[in-house]
Amino acid sequence: MSDNENLEQLMAIHTEQLFRIAYYYTKDLQLAEDIVQDVFIKFYHQKHYEERGEMKAYLARMTINKCKDYLKSWTYRKITFQHKFFTKQKSVLHDTLILQDEQDLLDEAILRLPIKPREAIVYYYLEEMTIKEIAELLEIPEGTVKSRLRKGKELLKVDLQNIEWEVLFHG
């Protein structure tokens, strides 16, 4: 099997998961796609990959690192400032009567979480990873993962407490 075929196979298997990770870090669909593409390009050009663990975890770690690098960058800070400045002016005019389903509301609440509790919530509940797997992936103690999950749930509870969930009335 050629390198190109191997890369295509890796992309077919892992793109969706890596995209979700990148999106939950960046909150931007196009940027998440770009980051995942960059991860695969970087992996392809690595001449010395040593298989020490699971490929899924290795690519996830590359994606997380790329996202964190971007979030530290000047480009990100400049775009964030511009977005906040200009959307505040528009948001006064924007009417919040747009209906959204519960999943959209929950996804948005997750995206509002600070990065550390958000990544724990995403990996545990959306990626269905164990606390041990999350600890290994993020290179932190299991107790820290539990603390971040607890903090994330507390913040979500506060954020979502005033929403009347339709699903509660269909039973």
Give residue ranges: language-model regions.
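C-terminal edge and immediately downstream basic/flexible tail or linker adjoining helix-turn-helix-like DNA-binding
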Residues: 1-8, 78-81, 136-139, 153-171
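Internal acidic/polar
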Residues: 77-106, 111, 130, 169-170
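Arg/Lys-rich amphipathic alpha helix in sigma70-family domain 2
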Residues: 64-81, 151
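Helix-turn-helix DNA-binding motif, specifically the short coil turn and the N-cap/start of the second
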Residues: 28, 130, 139-144
